[in-house]
């Protein structure tokens, strides 16, 4: 142990870099696990949509009009928080949220889960992942 302390004393830059890298890896892994708990691949979202899931688009009205998942409703993250009473009838149904890249969807699905929505999910990768799979969009 004494030799390890001596080594770090002589190689402070190397030791600091190792500690920073360990922290970066820990944060990355933590975020990955947190996102994957309630994140679904596009094919899984299609399956839930076929079972009658409620789909919520978190993007702007303009982006929504440019193309969205079939049957999706447009709501902002703030509207979801305020609309908990309106969405209450969907608490037991699958509910999928998405945005352009999946980042806002993670937060929204967590907020919904905290409000008692037991089947709230995020589209992993957002609309970008949906498009990458060449899945259809509805315009208007």
Model-derived regions: residue spans:
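Rhodanese-like catalytic fold shared by cysteine-dependent sulfurtransferases
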Residues: 1-39, 48-51, 61, 65-94, ...
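Structural scaffold elements adjacent to functional motifs in cytosolic proteins
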Residues: 55-57
